[in-house]
């Protein structure tokens, strides 16, 4: 899962 990783980075 890296879509969540990208989203988490954008969310932060």
Swiss-Prot record:
Tissue specificity annotation: Expressed by the venom gland.
The keyword Secreted is assigned to this record: yes
Molecular-function annotations in GO: toxin activity
Name listed for the protein in its UniProt record: Short cationic peptide-6d
Main location: secreted
Gene Ontology CC annotation, any one: extracellular region
Species name: Cupiennius salei (American wandering spider)
Keywords: Secreted, Toxin
Domain of life assignment: Eukaryota
Subcellular location(s) per record: Secreted
Family: Belongs to the cationic peptide 04 (cupiennin) family. 06 subfamily.
């Amino acid at each position: 899962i890296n879509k969540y990783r990208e989203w988490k980075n954008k969310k932060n």
